[in-house]
Curated annotation (Swiss-Prot):
<dbReference type="Pfam" id="PF01535">
    <property type="entry name" value="PPR"/>
</dbReference>
<feature type="repeat" description="PPR 4">
    <location>
        <begin position="159"/>
        <end position="184"/>
    </location>
</feature>
<protein>
    <recommendedName>
        <fullName>Putative pentatricopeptide repeat-containing protein At1g77010, mitochondrial</fullName>
    </recommendedName>
</protein>
<feature type="transit peptide" description="Mitochondrion">
    <location>
        <begin position="1"/>
        <end position="64"/>
    </location>
</feature>
<dbReference type="GO" id="GO:0009451">
    <property type="term" value="P:RNA modification"/>
</dbReference>
<comment type="similarity">
    <text>Belongs to the PPR family. PCMP-E subfamily.</text>
</comment>
<keyword id="KW-0677">Repeat</keyword>
<feature type="repeat" description="PPR 2">
    <location>
        <begin position="92"/>
        <end position="122"/>
    </location>
</feature>
<feature type="repeat" description="PPR 6">
    <location>
        <begin position="221"/>
        <end position="251"/>
    </location>
</feature>
<dbReference type="GO" id="GO:0003723">
    <property type="term" value="F:RNA binding"/>
</dbReference>
<dbReference type="Pfam" id="PF20431">
    <property type="entry name" value="E_motif"/>
</dbReference>
<feature type="repeat" description="PPR 1">
    <location>
        <begin position="61"/>
        <end position="91"/>
    </location>
</feature>
<feature type="repeat" description="PPR 12">
    <location>
        <begin position="418"/>
        <end position="448"/>
    </location>
</feature>
<feature type="repeat" description="PPR 7">
    <location>
        <begin position="252"/>
        <end position="282"/>
    </location>
</feature>
<dbReference type="InterPro" id="IPR002885">
    <property type="entry name" value="Pentatricopeptide_rpt"/>
</dbReference>
<dbReference type="InterPro" id="IPR046848">
    <property type="entry name" value="E_motif"/>
</dbReference>
<feature type="repeat" description="PPR 14">
    <location>
        <begin position="484"/>
        <end position="514"/>
    </location>
</feature>
Amino acid sequence: MILKYNSSYRFYLSSSFLQAMEVDCRRYYVRLLQSCSSRNRETLWRQTNGLLLKKGFLSSIVIVANHLLQMYSRSGKMGIARNLFDEMPDRNYFSWNTMIEGYMNSGEKGTSLRFFDMMPERDGYSWNVVVSGFAKAGELSVARRLFNAMPEKDVVTLNSLLHGYILNGYAEEALRLFKELNFSADAITLTTVLKACAELEALKCGKQIHAQILIGGVECDSKMNSSLVNVYAKCGDLRMASYMLEQIREPDDHSLSALISGYANCGRVNESRGLFDRKSNRCVILWNSMISGYIANNMKMEALVLFNEMRNETREDSRTLAAVINACIGLGFLETGKQMHCHACKFGLIDDIVVASTLLDMYSKCGSPMEACKLFSEVESYDTILLNSMIKVYFSCGRIDDAKRVFERIENKSLISWNSMTNGFSQNGCTVETLEYFHQMHKLDLPTDEVSLSSVISACASISSLELGEQVFARATIVGLDSDQVVSSSLIDLYCKCGFVEHGRRVFDTMVKSDEVPWNSMISGYATNGQGFEAIDLFKKMSVAGIRPTQITFMVVLTACNYCGLVEEGRKLFESMKVDHGFVPDKEHFSCMVDLLARAGYVEEAINLVEEMPFDVDGSMWSSILRGCVANGYKAMGKKAAEKIIELEPENSVAYVQLSAIFATSGDWESSALVRKLMRENNVTKNPGSSWTDC
């Protein structure tokens, strides 16, 4: 009868009606509380609370008090719930569990655990609340300690802990726990463990779980079949993935997404796109899989085109934006990246940690570190991922002290945090700091991976310390990373910078070369040792091997042409970069070409290239032209170059001296004197040269 009243007035009348009754009517009060809860009426909760207190039902009827306690707990009003709990003379499992769960859901994990410890007796639900709560919050050591303390472990709590491990990136630990306990697993357990197999690409383990499902007669629902599709697809067994997909009467988007990603990860992009196109009314998950598949296969332009198509059908999410921003990074499309920043603000995704971190990375790698710093100052919440990204940003613009300060702010420093520091120091030429931090990692017994090893070897290469670099590589051999592509590429760089190009080439010839990184290292090695023709020959072999060059590849091969004066080869490569490979040359490519042309005496062509360049010209390019003019006796163009340098960099003493010399050699002593006078008036001084000799 009570639940038929809809208006607040009638509802209150119903409580007044009950108030007038003199009989014990606990079931009506329970229904009254349920009705209050369903309508989310806080005023009536309080009125009902007062009524129950007045009538003495809170002390005499536990079930009534528990329902009121649950209402306050679920609405996050834990202060009121605590007062009510303290007033209850009798409490049962439900009372304690409600408080434990309420505090856990409100983020007060410590208080929740204190209530759990005070609880006279605990049931399975009590254990599950604290274990799952700490697991979801990422405090896995606490969750595992509680799980180990359970007198009787149950499959529900096990599932919560397994899910927590996978959710927080510890899939390997989830598998280890599953194997250790040897539980009688239910469908949820097996589905969860299959997720771990997919994350780790553990095909053998996935097949074992599949066999266990078949032998045990476990009913395969759509979720379990989807998980099996995901395992086989991620592990590259596309035949089995397709077979499992056929077993699903109505495949969900997660299953299709897994297979689309599987085809893409194996380089079968056309089949991936065919599967994608067969589906109508595609959800964001499918779009994300296809966009990510294009990016994984270095088809970043296709990814951007597909993103534009997506916007006509559905709205992007944080994963979409992160993928598209990564495509912008690969293509060097700063303006498109800025548009993605606007999208993130427009759709409320800017506070997503992954999106913010990717934007920071984009601004840093696309030459706008100040924009990254501005974004970082506007971000309201941080996590380790975002702080690690900011460390890289600060290192990219040489703000080493700021990078150190951010590193100190990270409470739980991960291997990625330490690697960000060693890599940043190495890139900024801080060899001593690189070695110090690597030594600290060793003292803390942190694992050594390819990133830390390659950073330290690169630091050794920067000071041409072959002996120290080989000692670090010996460490790589001990931990089984001597064949790693990144580590081997660093070793090539070490040998070449120490002048042992043949040693570097031997490493290159014997290693696996799946991407452009080792090719870039070897081409750069030839360039720094003045072997331009060898660098160009290796660049051609790279194309024959099916490895697509990047902008960095073109930078190192153009540098080789510059060092060796290979003008015609440089022209062809610069043109091929634009026409054949679709790259837009950046400032560094233009600068290298200008220096190449000016050195070889093609000063007028170099000036034309500078004036046609779609970037703001800095003094360094005009300095290259000025050196070319002085070397080849082009006084008129040298005068123009020197004047441009003085205009852009008024404190550049070299430009004044060279301009004065140009006037003097042409007999215009008056103009030469005026330049010297202007130099003095602007307080520009030239530091005297000096040399050191061993005695």
